[in-house]
């Protein structure tokens, strides 16, 4: 027994010597401790049972006995006793280690239990904090106010800052940062806790509500936010601010300071002029590209007039006012609907400028004409595409659905075949329904919505021409101001921003005329002489109607097209009783209009140095017993010196002695006689290819100018009969064609004469002293005998109590003969002497 124990201990010691790894020792110790906890009785009784090794049967070793081993046997016994004592000591040390590990494990378990208790308490504390979705910080629940309209929560600091920013930028429809639900004003008051911001909020809310009222008018005084709800005050437009200490009087219509002796347009024009002068003097008022904001980037809201800045970042043109909530288009500045950008209004969703008038009209005509063809083409393509495409789409969807599943091929193919067959049956029905509904909708849009939207916006470019049919205007409104600088305009048109004083507001007496003209293709309008632009004057004479309109452009290099339409329908027997309204647009500030006696006289026809000319066609009808009055208006540019031409006629003379004047040369003439009615058609053309005729006319003028006599208007006043005649001879006579006239006589006593007469001067001291040299007046007459001389004609005009009676002496000198196409034309000299009695 003792030998077995010694052998076991020796084997155990050998095992200890072999297993010197501390990790393996610890694992074995843990295993032993576990066995002890399980309550093994055999391990507790034996001291050596602490080490449980598996019983391994080893093969018996063959012993070899030698002579030396016999002599060393005693020494081995002593060594074994020593090893036994060492094994006992090792077992004791291992047991001490086990006891220490057990105590450590118990302490670890105790610390784990205490730490678990601490973690539970910490988790309970962490559960009381919530993360803010705005600042991403964790705060306690009491820092998250409850909102009435939604369940989202944010910390009070973030909400307060959010509300401050929204109110300071006048956005009063404040919604939740995480959804679109709006805040209740009570919640806003509780979160802000700021009386000043709440007053601003309430003021913006009130302003937003009042702006929607069409009868609300805000006081125009600075720093006055008082509003007047003026219901039914259109007939009495004078309003007074009711705020204490203000009392500002303003107009109901234009919403500006009260203007007692002016119309709204005149007051607006005066304000625009003063604003323009201040802008010129102070460069800090006007916005420029250097300051970072262009004038096109700042526009007022069409409803509340609050100024809005649009960033030039390629954003869309659908704008929403932050003050009143008005949705409008940035290009046309009009309140828009859902179909605004789909209709041919010319406004694009992302563009920087609207379409031109020409492009809009072409788009409209193309839509109206090509809509049936386009719709039929779309329907013809859609029907087969739907019939073929729907089954293919259904088959692919079913195949993709069954592709990744454990389904047999037979079942999958059956499902695909069934779906395709069903879709083949259904697809024609779907195509028919789609085309049957879509085609009427498209036709209704093209022929219903498009014309209505165009007529409502006034952008169709089609207007009535004084009962003479339909007129289509192709001139581009947006290109008029090309090349000009930013002009300060007080919500007026470009024409109103210029110096356009309206002189006289009389009725035309039934005389109707329509003449719209813009400058021809000119690159150098400023090449015309300065004396024309500085000394030009427009005469509104009795018996005539001169209507001038300014096209309103500050351009130097402009490319516009001339379009003239004249309707002449008035027939009268006398010359008196007519008045005209003239709008001056010249650069000169001292240009004036004088009402004087006489017939309608012509003005200047300047030509560009590069040969650009203005072409006008006028059709005149006359009857033997009636005389026709013509009225026209021309639209000229600021930099050019083109002047309005007027044609007229005189009556009240004996039959056979009367003469009619014409202000343009005739290029073509024909003889037509229809039942006693005489019809004359003429076309005025100014060309530069008649150099030989120009030289002849210049020689004639030079010879006649030396013989012309200058009559006196009074004892102390200089000549008035020769004003501005040199300009006419230099610009008009130098480029005119040879005059061709024809006349068909209904009776031997009826004669018609055509004359080219220069304009009468304005009676002004500074103009009379600088009047140019005299020029002869060429008269082309065609009578039966070509020898009749006009007698003295008296034209009298009464104005108030003062009578001015100029006497015109007409007599003819030597006749100039010219043969052209077997027609004889006689050019006579005309000398005019004007005498006045005041």
From Swiss-Prot:
The chain crosses the membrane at residues 368-388, 424-444. The active site is at 316. It is an enzyme of class 2 (transferase). It is found in: Membrane; Cytoplasm, Cytoskeleton, Microtubule organizing center, Centrosome. Residues 46-57 have a biased composition (Low complexity). Its EC number is 2.3.2.31. Residues 41-61, 622-685, 700-721 are annotated as: Disordered. Interacts with UBE2L3 and UBE2L6. Interacts with transcription factor Sp1. Interacts with VCP, CASR, SNCAIP and with some SOD1 variants which cause amyotrophic lateral sclerosis, but not with wild-type SOD1. This is E3 ubiquitin-protein ligase RNF19A. The lineage of its organism: Eukaryota, Metazoa, Chordata, Craniata, Vertebrata.
